[in-house]
Amino acid sequence: MKKVFYSLFAAFVLTACGSEKQAPIDREALVARNNPQVASFDSLASLSVGNGEFAFTVDATGLQTFPSMYSKGVPLGTQSQWGWHSFANPQGYKSEEVLKAFDFGRGHEELYACQFKEEGRQKEASDWFRVNPHRLHLGIVGLELGEGVKASDITDIRQTLNMWKGEITSHFTLNGNAFDVRTVCHPDQDMISASVTSRAHAGVNLRFPYPTGAHADDACNWDANDKHSTTIVRQDAQSAVLKRVLDETTYYVTLRWEGKANLAEKSKNYFVLTPDEDMLAFSCLFTPNFQGTVFESEPPVYADGQVLPSFTETAAASASYWTNFWTNGAAVDFSHCTDPRAGELERRVVLSQYLLAIQSAGSVPPQETGLTYNSWFGKFHLEMIWWHQAWQPLWGHTDLLDRTLGWYETVEPVAREIARRQGFPGVRWMKMTDPNGTEAPSNVGSFLIWQQPHFIYLAELVYRSNPSDEVIQKYNKLVQETAEFMYAFATYDEFHGRFILKGAIPAQETLRAATTINPPFELSYWHFAMQTA
């Protein structure tokens, strides 16, 4: 029966999409016909450039000129994998304070990180650990168009995201002056480069917010200037370095511009780069550390700063990276399909690859909202990595998944401690977490288990794309440690002579851990992972 079904299905696909022998796919044409186009200010139509480690999202001007207009839609984020912050902890909350003991009939006590709801220190502690750390908005980079200019003053908007090159081109008119903006992201640095051409000599502003610590928002608190600072620590005729200090968090913003321009502080945490010419080209790099030498004096001297790539160099690097991305790996051309849904399906396939490559392919697992804005305080959920990244080895981009899986090794000691305090060997992968592997307290997340087999599944995908001893040696230790926990977590049912799963909340998150036995998805996934390991 299965063979008959698959034969009929294949015949249907070939009929719908044309069964005649096709020439090789014109990949550039495939990508180009799906390039997003924007012709107005639309808070749900922001565009992004990025590299998996860093992403920069813009409005219809090609930069982040009107962030408040987009804050309730798809916000104009500047986010990285390293940019995190924690509010002060004067009460000295400790992670042990959010642990609660449970007995699920496995012969030992199990300690889970819970979210306490009753007023008191435990609630305060669990609230603090859920909020902290949170991901930072690293800074707004927008056009300085003049006092009182509104989005409604701008006309003749024509904007395109060229996914083949990773470049956003934006054209618009303001007060009779035409503006042309090109925006790119460097493939190997947390840096954007842009060129702005206009007879209006419009400047570029850099504005820096304090974090909100909110569950889901653009992470921009513009009413807390007294809680953070931005200072120019190094400047010459073509570059400057700004130092950001937010509580215990410090990072740096390095600028390089071409031609004559002047950088000045307009107000606290607000700087403007003003050109003397019709074109302003600049690069803006965000780093956790100063890229040079710091001489500890009073005040400190910042020397030998990094010389940033120019706009032209960054645009060339971006085009090279994206051309290579699209040229290699899988591609599907739906242009010969007669089904009326084919065009939309093709658009989603192409755009999804671009978005997931810039938002969900970094050195740590992806946030559910990528690097655009904060959800769940900017933290990532390990059960969701499958949706973001399982496609990568299947579509010939194994290297993207490979660099993310390395994170699991760095947090292995944390995962081992979670398993230990619950009375199990091996490692138990956390659900809601951050780059350090800190387990966020939750009355649901801490009891989920469907994230546990993911590591084995994803490592298997890497192996299938490159079946070698090298891959086995790289991942086998963590695969076995993951399986060791899974074996111990399963309870032997002596009456029925079988192993069962209990004391866990299923993926749909509505059932209770104390009364759930053998959730079918988790049970089948456990079986697959144990066989694979």
Where are the predicted features?
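Beta-strand segments within the central parallel beta-sheet cores of soluble alpha/beta enzyme folds
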Residues: 27-29, 35, 206, 369, ...
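Carboxylate/His-rich catalytic cores and anion/metal-binding grooves
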Residues: 349, 382-427
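The feature captures the catalytic groove of carbohydrate-active enzymes
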Residues: 367-378, 425-472, 481-533
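Sec-dependent signal peptide recognition
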Residues: 2-8
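Acidic/polar, glycine-enriched structural segments that form the non-catalytic walls/loops
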Residues: 19-379, 398, 408-414
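Long, well-ordered core segments of solenoidal/helical folds
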Residues: 355-360, 400, 404-419, 477-494
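C-terminal motif of bacterial Sec signal peptides marking the signal peptidase cleavage site
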Residues: 15-16
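Alpha-helical support elements that line or immediately flank enzyme active sites
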Residues: 356, 385-401, 453-468
